[in-house]
């Protein structure tokens, strides 16, 4: 690492720590030539490959913005959206891959969003999975019901939004 003061081509690492959010490493360095100290912050780049083939850096803000649209009119706080964004970023970084597709990012969003709000999950999934018929929605709702019923019997549940109501005329 070049010294920013004297441009010496080398430096010694004095201290290394992870940042509070755990996504970067902060290094305190010292120049062997001028003995001045400076700090560097190192972050592994995470790139997203879009459908068009264009590659761009992963953006937690973009994830939150997309999920916010699905949560419009729902009782979801900004804090909950920020936590979801962090969980998604942690999940995609945990893959160890430097490049991900938008499909991979979408998959990483679905799980935490389903725990956060079922209606927002269904809205997001309808766009992400390109629902084009009523049957697609019905299949997704049936899948949600199947997933929730065993959890409710055991006293658990995946989110605090209550049970998925059964439409009139379909009850046993």
From Swiss-Prot:
Essential cofactor(s): Zn(2+)
One GO BP annotation of this record: negative regulation of DNA-templated transcription
**Keywords in alphabetical order:** ATP-binding, DNA-binding, Metal-binding, Nucleotide-binding, Repressor, Transcription, Transcription regulation, Zinc, Zinc-finger
Any idea where the ATP-cone domain is? 46-136
TM ranges are none
Query: Is the keyword Flavoprotein in the record?
Result: no
Identify the domain of life. Bacteria
- unnamed zinc-finger residues: 3-34
Statement: the UniProt record of this protein carries the keyword Repressor: yes
Which residue intervals are annotated with compositional bias (Low complexity) in the record? 161-172
Give me the comment on cofactor binding: Binds 1 zinc ion.
Check the record and name the InterPro entries matching this protein.
ATP-cone_dom, NrdR-like_N, RNR_NrdR-like
Please list where the region (Disordered) is annotated: 152-172
Q: Can you list the disulfide-bonded cysteine pairs?
A: none
A molecular function (GO) term: DNA binding
* Family, per entry: Belongs to the NrdR family.
Function, in words: Negatively regulates transcription of bacterial ribonucleotide reductase nrd genes and operons by binding to NrdR-boxes.
Output the PANTHER family linked to this UniProt entry. TRANSCRIPTIONAL REPRESSOR NRDR (PTHR30455:SF2)
State the HAMAP family in the record: NrdR
- What protein does this entry describe? Transcriptional repressor NrdR
């Amino acid at each position: 690492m070049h010294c920013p003061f004297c441009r010496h081509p080398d430096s010694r690492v004095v201290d290394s720590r992870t940042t509070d959010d755990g996504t970067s490493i902060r290094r305190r360095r010292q120049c062997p030539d001028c003995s001045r100290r400076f700090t560097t912050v190192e972050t592994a780049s995470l790139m997203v490959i879009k459908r068009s083939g264009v590659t761009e850096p992963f953006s937690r803000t973009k994830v939150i913005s997309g999920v916010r649209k699905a949560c419009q009119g729902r009782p979801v706080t900004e804090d909950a959206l920020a936590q979801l964004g962090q969980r998604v970023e942690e999940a995609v970084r945990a893959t160890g891959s430097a490049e991900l597709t938008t499909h991979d990012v979408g998959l990483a969003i679905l799980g935490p969003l389903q725990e956060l709000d079922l209606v927002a999950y269904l809205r997001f999934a309808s766009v992400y999975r390109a629902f084009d018929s009523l049957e697609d929605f019905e299949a997704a709702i049936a899948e949600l019901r199947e997933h929730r019923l065993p959890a409710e019997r055991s006293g658990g549940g995946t989110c605090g939004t209550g049970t998925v109501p059964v439409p009139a005329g379909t009850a046993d």
